[in-house]
Amino acid sequence: MKMIVRRTALAVCTLVLAVILPTAASAACTGFDDLPETADCYESVMYLAEHEITQGTGNGYFSPDAPVTVRQWAMLLCRAYDVKVEGSSWSDLSQSAVEQAYRKGWLNETALSAPNIQLCRGALLKSAFAAAKIPVYDSVLYAGGVSLPDHENCIRIGKELQLCGEANTANEIVTCRDAAMLLHAILTRAFTVTAPEAPVTLVNAAGVNINDYLLALRQVPEPMLAAFKVAGWTYRIDFDYISDLSKQLNMSCIGATSYGQKTIYISEASATLHEFGHFLDYALGFPAEHERLYLAESQNSSLRDYAKTNSREFFADCFVYWITYSADKKRMDDFRDAAPQTYAYMKKLATNNWGA
């Protein structure tokens, strides 16, 4: 699966604190005194300037080596993607930009409390990718890959797309030069990112980045994934279906399993294990033992209240608990002490490859 992303520049904000929302078109830019034509960022900066994106730091200077703050970058993104900001001063306008960028998912919560901090390259790339809808997948999802932090995955993708150099690191502070070159690239170039192969039939009806969903599927035991695929089941990311179901049931749902349609419907990746617990219940033929265990031990278990409503929810949550905490001795001891028969039953299932 490949995703191609392309953006065309319409309007982009200033890179520097000194430039504040010009209300009238400026004269054609003739260059900056501190930016020779031989500079590697010259083309990018001139593109931004000619499109009235930046006027530099004043007095004919661009200051390419000046660090870029979260506040400045937020303004940049809001102008780039025509997001309205409000205020009568730079402080108000840029704070509005930070808040808007956060709402759009372009910046994280830290940006709200610390808008004046300087951006590192990993954060800059993550934000740019989010704004441009360029998907980032964890390296562990590819053959031979290992799990990496978000910023490291962004650096990896940045290098693959030639948006940063091989020597660049996630934690290094970025400058106006870096921001200008990155912005110019994501607004004017097309990018192709190959998605990792899903272990089951996956339908992305919501059209979202499937990274978190693929990571959630990695938690499901391989024998179950194989059985799911062989049985002709589908894992479907479908916000509309879940929303309609929530309204019908008058409750908040994030996942559902349809035995008739052989489909797991998901809106949040965190529901994946629970819904696969329902699939396992189905694959085992809804054993009477599950009802017996529910009646005998559910109320004394340490599981959430929802797990105590019926045998199917109890079994699904037992599966989630087992997969999530199987390496945590204390958690497993607590489970065994509270529900010894259920513990023994789940242990036997796990030992026997979950009935595969």
Language-model-detected regions and their locations in the chain:
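Alpha-helix boundary/N-cap detector
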Residues: 92, 149, 208-211, 215, ...
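Active-site-flanking segments in enzyme catalytic domains
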Residues: 203, 216-356
